[in-house]
C-alpha cells in the first residue's frame, strides 16, 4: 500500500526577496565588526538532510538558551509555488522551546548583543554632559514599555545628533546600508588586515526590516 504524503506544518514568516541580504549582514557583523562574533552561521550545504532549509543562524543567549532563525526555500503553499523565501524564528531554553515573533526575537538578541545605554548615562544627561554610550539596537525596545529614563536618553541622543554636522546625521540614517554594501564586497570572506583599524560598531535595524518580513 502506497504511503500518503506527509506534511510538516510550522509557523513561518514570509520574506518577499532573496536571503542574500540577510546572509550578507550576518557575515558582515560576525566577521567584520565582531558584533555577532559568537553567532553560528550555517549555510544550506552544511545543514544536512533538511534540503528545504536555506540557512540557519543561531544566536547563543544567556542562561543556556539560544535563538535560531531558520530560512526556508522551495516551499509549497495551497496553490502553485511559493516564489518568496520564509523564515522560522525559534527560541530554545533548557526546559522548553517556542516560536516567537520578530519583535520578541529583537528583544532576545538585544539582551546579549549590541550595546545599550549604560547605568551612568542618566546622571550625565542631568548634568548636561555628553553621553558616552548609545543604544545600537533601538528597534528591540519598540515591543516594550520604555522607562522614563530610557525615553529621556533617546531624546538627548537625538538632540546631540541634530546639533552635529550633516555627515553625522547621514551616518545614522544609512549605517546598516553601508554595512550591507561592505558585506557584498566581502562576500567571498573577510581576510584579516593587520594595518587596518577595526571597523566601527554598527546599528542593527531589526529582523523585520532586514528580512522585509510580511506578517
From Swiss-Prot:
Stretches the record annotates as Multimerization: 154-167
Localization of this protein: Host cytoplasm; Host cell membrane; Virion
Motif HCCH motif in this chain: 110-141
Ranges spanned by the short sequence motif BC-box-like motif, renumbered to the chain: 147-156
Post-translational changes noted in the entry: Processed in virion by the viral protease.
PTM sites of type Phosphothreonine: 98
GO biological process, one term: viral life cycle
Pfam families with a match to the protein in the record: Vif (PF00559)
Region entry Disordered, spans: 162-203
Ranges of compositional bias, category Basic and acidic residues: 173-189
GO cellular component, one term: host cell plasma membrane
Factors inducing expression: Expressed late during infection in a Rev-dependent manner.
Post-translational modification Phosphoserine, affected residues: 147
UniProt keyword list: AIDS, Host cell membrane, Host cytoplasm, Host membrane, Host-virus interaction, Membrane, Phosphoprotein, Ubl conjugation, Ubl conjugation pathway, Virion
Membrane topology designation: Peripheral membrane protein
Annotated domain remarks: The BC-like-box motif mediates the interaction with elongin BC complex. The HCCH motif (H-x(5)-C-x(18)-C-x(5)-H) mediates the interaction with CUL5.
Function: Counteracts the innate antiviral activity of APOBEC3G. Forms a complex with host APOBEC3G thus preventing the entry of this lethally hypermutating enzyme into progeny virions. Functions as an adapter molecule, recruiting APOBEC3G to the ubiquitin-proteasome machinery. Targets APOBEC3G for degradation through the assembly with elongin BC complex, CUL5 and RBX1. Binds viral RNA and affects the stability of viral nucleoprotein core. May play a role in viral morphology.
Additional free-text comment from the UniProt record: Required for replication in 'nonpermissive' cells, including primary T-cells, macrophages and certain T-cell lines, but is dispensable for replication in 'permissive' cell lines, such as 293T cells. In nonpermissive cells, Vif-defective viruses can produce virions, but they fail to complete reverse transcription and cannot successfully infect new cells.
Subunit structure: Homomultimer; in vitro and presumably in vivo. Interacts with viral Pr55Gag precursor and human APOBEC3G. The interaction between Vif and APOBEC3G is species-specific, which may play a role in restricting the replication of HIV to humans. Forms an E3 ligase complex by interacting with human CUL5 and elongin BC complex (ELOB and ELOC).
Similarity field: Belongs to the primate lentivirus group Vif protein family.
The protein's name: Virion infectivity factor
Source organism of the structure: Human immunodeficiency virus type 2 subtype A (isolate NIH-Z)
Amino acid at each position: 500500500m502506497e504511503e500518503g504524503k506527509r506534511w510538516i506544518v510550522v509557523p513561518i514568516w514570509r520574506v518577499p526577496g532573496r536571503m542574500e541580504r540577510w546572509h550578507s549582514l550576518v557575515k558582515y557583523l560576525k566577521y567584520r565588526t565582531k558584533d555577532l562574533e559568537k553567532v553560528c552561521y550555517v549555510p544550506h550545504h552544511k545543514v544536512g538532510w533538511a534540503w528545504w532549509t536555506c540557512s540557519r543562524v543561531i544566536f547563543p543567549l544567556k542562561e543556556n538558551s539560544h535563538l535560531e532563525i531558520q530560512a526556508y526555500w522551495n516551499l509549497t503553499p495551497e496553490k502553485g509555488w511559493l516564489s518568496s523565501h520564509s523564515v522560522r524564528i525559534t527560541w530554545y531554553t533548557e526546559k522548553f522551546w517556542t516560536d516567537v515573533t520578530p519583535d520578541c526575537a529583537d528583544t532576545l538578541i538585544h539582551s546579549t548583543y549590541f550595546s545599550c545605554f549604560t547605568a551612568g548615562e542618566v546622571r550625565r544627561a542631568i548634568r548636561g554632559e555628553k553621553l558616552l554610550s548609545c543604544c545600537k539596537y533601538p528597534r528591540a525596545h519598540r515591543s516594550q514599555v520604555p522607562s522614563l529614563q530610557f525615553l529621556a536618553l533617546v531624546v538627548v541622543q537625538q538632540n546631540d545628533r541634530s546639533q552635529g554636522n550633516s555627515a553625522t546625521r547621514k551616518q545614522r540614517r544609512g549605517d546598516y546600508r553601508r554595512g550591507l554594501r561592505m558585506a557584498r564586497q566581502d562576500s567571498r570572506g573577510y581576510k584579516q588586515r593587520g594595518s587596518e583599524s577595526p571597523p566601527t560598531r554598527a546599528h542593527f535595524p531589526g529582523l523585520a526590516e532586514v528580512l522585509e518580513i510580511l506578517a
